[in-house]
Amino acid sequence: MSKVITFGEIMLRLKSPGLERFFQSPSLEATFGGGEANVAVSLANYGMEAGYITVLPDNDISKACLRELRGFGVDVSNVTYGEGRFGIYFLESGANQRPSKVIYDRAYSSIALAKPGDVDFVKAFGDATWFHITGITPAVSETAAELSLEAVKTAKKMGLTVSCDLNFRKNLWKYGKEAKEVMSELTKYVDVIIANEEDCQKSLGIENNQKVESGELDTKKYEELAKAVLDKYPDAKKIAITLRESKSASHNNWSACIYNRKEFYVSKKYEIKNIVDRVGGGDSFAGGLIYGLNNYETDAQALEFAVAASCLKHSIGGDFNRASLSEVKALMGGDGSGRVQR
């Protein structure tokens, strides 16, 4: 049976209630979230063995966080305690023409201070078959980037399949290196690349010239982009690219494509109106894709599962995708009516 390990930072998520602006009312909703943890939760939720590695301060907030992850069935036995603090991000959900806003407070977090050798990846990967990482943790600090590179090199050496969601975050790359410099090296060790057009441009230096703000996307250009990425990274086996047509903060069209050096496939498109929470939508796609590639015969089926999983996440508040395996399969199979299930 496949076991997936993810590695990265989990944060305290502080969100303004509903669609309010920051401190429009004197309260913030506190939950936890982080790209790699979100993927682990999705996989555990679908019945796969999933483990999560991070570095946290030894305090009550960390213990509450780990209790929540255990509650989803995620193995956190390889979490390491270190110096520093628990990272935070603040979220204000957008509506219509007002975009969502994220403010990071991650300086001097435990994972930002962590360095190569602080995590026993050999032990953590002992019974695993798949390792997943993102481009977020390498953006936090230079030592976190070095630790991330150590992780992918170790996973590759031990024979694990390695996936990476490039996840470019412009507000995080502050320590003197550009994303392209760091991620171009890390991606050399990746088997399955997950990205959007901005990730390919900012993290890998590969242009697409697609205007996502127009609300309409040309899939032919994405096929060219996918081929260009795999041409640059000959050891990568496939790339999945998410296609988000943003009509407004509340209304998106959502689909994706996958290329495996032989075939290029574009998924069905979902029109998502009245978005509840799009944060974690990309992580839900990544988790769905990893599940699909481990449980379906074709890449096309895996992609359809991933897109359906992510579509459902847009209807669920919080970072974690709480959609069940049966719900994802039902939507994947064409039941998107939203009718009451009795």
Predicted regions and their residues:
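Conserved N-terminal subdomain of the carbohydrate kinase-like
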Residues: E49-I136, V328-R342
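Alpha-helix C-terminal capping segments
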Residues: T31, N38-E49, G292-N295
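Positively charged, low-complexity intrinsically disordered leader regions
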Residues: M1-R21
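Conserved phosphate/ATP/ADP-binding segment of small-molecule kinases
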Residues: L172-K262
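A short helix->loop->beta-strand "cap" motif at the edges of active sites that frequently abuts
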Residues: K156-T161, Y233-K237
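Hydrophobic beta-strand scaffold residues
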Residues: A50, V76, V162-S163, I194
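Conserved post-catalytic alpha-helical subdomain immediately downstream of the catalytic base
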Residues: Y265-D335
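Short catalytic helix/loop segments, enriched in acidic residues and glycine
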Residues: R21-V39
